[in-house]
Amino acid sequence: MNDYLVKSIDKTKNLRLLTITAKGVVSEAQKRHDLWSASSAVLGRTLVGSLLLAGAELTDKEELTVRLLGNGPVGPAIVTATADLKVKGYVKNPHIALPPKENGHIDVKKAVGQGWFEVTKDLGLKEPYTGQVPIVSGEIAEDFAYYLTKSEQIPSAVGLSVFVNPNNSIGEAGGFMLQALPGASDALIDKTIKRINELPALSTSFLDGMTPEDLARKILGTDCKILEKDDVAFSCDCSKEKYAGILETLKSSQLKDMINEDHGAELICNFCGNKYHYTEDELKEILAKKKDDKDY
């Protein structure tokens, strides 16, 4: 099954739902960062949640960055998602595996720890906007929902799932984001939340072949309307040219050290793990552009 996101609405047009399958996205992140189980669960859920949030809120060339700033062993998770549903991200500590909980599941809450949940939106305005709430759960889905409810005043329910196989490969990944629109009654919201609470585990359902459309009908009812379906992907916009621009911001003395002592430089993208090597000659070209530097 390809990775994609579905937007739907209930028959009363008072509840909006986004559902997603994203095994390929999380698998790509797992391979690029060599993630172990707990790190995969934390980054995977944050990737899936960020795609849902981007699908719900972004248009045109807007983007958002989610920072899960926990003090647990996995460390911070940083994820950026765009309006066209491209996502990239990383965790500080990729090689974390923890003893499973009694039910056999990964202890995501322990992996995340306590701290802050931040969302920065770049909407093309002068200054990006950042909203921040405390991490209230550490299970990540509840933290997305709490952020939406408290920071953006959008009553929401979120479910996120990443199943990690014993060999650290990804068995499935997906989730949903339910948002109450202004006309939603308490009775409608309560009935829908009851449906969600009665669902089997998302991981089991996705492993059994459930699609985002199936999940939408389970949550909103079979009479819901599917509005659109969009592909999602792990994608990083880094390039050798972009990193050359970063090298140009260094002091000339630092570039000289790279040339004379290291005889080159290698830069690694945190988000995707791509490596970019610069030879002495390439560094000299960059240095030549800095002739006007006072420390040249």
Swiss-Prot record:
GO terms for molecular function: protein folding chaperone; unfolded protein binding. GO terms for cellular component: cytoplasm. It is found in: Cytoplasm. Disulfide bonds join C236-C238, C269-C272. Under oxidizing conditions two disulfide bonds are formed involving the reactive cysteines. Under reducing conditions zinc is bound to the reactive cysteines and the protein is inactive. It comes from the Bacteria. Its main location: cytoplasm. Redox regulated molecular chaperone. Protects both thermally unfolding and oxidatively damaged proteins from irreversible aggregation. Plays an important role in the bacterial defense system toward oxidative stress. Belongs to the HSP33 family. This is 33 kDa chaperonin. It comes from Lactobacillus acidophilus (strain ATCC 700396 / NCK56 / N2 / NCFM). The gene is hslO.
